Amino acid sequence: MSKLYIICIILFYSLFIGVKAHAQYAGAKYEKGPSPKMEILQVDNRELSTMVYMAYTTPDADNWNETSSWMNFGDKTFIQVEGSSKQYHMISTINMPINSEAENKYMMFDRRNQRHQFILEFEKIPEGKSFDIIEDVNNPNAFNFYGITYTPTDSNSYVDVDEFIAGYPVKEMGRYVVKGN
C-alpha cells in the first residue's frame, strides 16, 4: 500500500511541475514587422519547443494579388532573444510551406481580405524575454519581426492546433530542381 501511495504522490507532483514548466501567452505584440496585416496571436513555450501562432490577412485593395498572392517562410528562419546572439532555429511549420534552396513552396491566396492562420515552431527559447523572428535580415521583403513582447501575467490555455488551423486550409504550390535544372 505504501508503494502505491508513493507512486501516486510522485505522479501528482510530476504532473503539477509539468504544467507549471510550460507557459502560453496571448496578445504578443511587435515593434516592427513586415505588415500590419500580420498578427502574432499566441506564444507557447512547450517542453521542447516554442510555438508562435500567427495569422495573415491579404489586403482589401483591388490589386491585392500584385503584392500578396502568395507567402511562405524560409528554411533558415530563426528567433533571436534580446541580449543574446544565439539563434533558435525554426524546426517546422504547421499550415505554412517552408521554402528552401532545393524546393520552392508557396501558400497561394485566392482573394482579397483572405485570412490564413499558421504556426511556426522553433527550438525552445527562454521564457519572459522579448525576441525577434528573422527570416532574412538582408531582404526588405522578408518576414522579419523585431521587438516581440508578451506579458508573462497574460498566461492563457494551450491552443488546440487542429481547431486553430481547421478553417484555413493551405493551398500549396511548389517546384523543385532536378540535376541543376
Residue ranges and their predicted role:
Residues 147-181:
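Pro/Ala/Gly-rich low-complexity, hydrophilic intrinsically disordered segments
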Residues 52, 116-118, 146:
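Hydrophobic residues positioned within well-ordered beta-strands of beta-sheet architectures
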Residues 48-61:
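Short, well-ordered beta-strand segments enriched in hydrophobic/aromatic residues
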Residues 86-131, 138-139:
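Short, solvent-exposed, Trp/other aromatic-anchored flexible loops in extracytoplasmic proteins
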Residues 58-108:
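The feature marks short-to-medium sequence segments in extracytoplasmic or secretory-pathway proteins
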Residues 135-150:
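Terminal connector regions
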Residues 1-26:
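Bacterial Sec-dependent N-terminal signal peptides
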Residues 24-48, 88-100:
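Low-complexity, acidic Ser/Thr/Pro/Gly-rich terminal tails and inter-domain linkers that flank the onset
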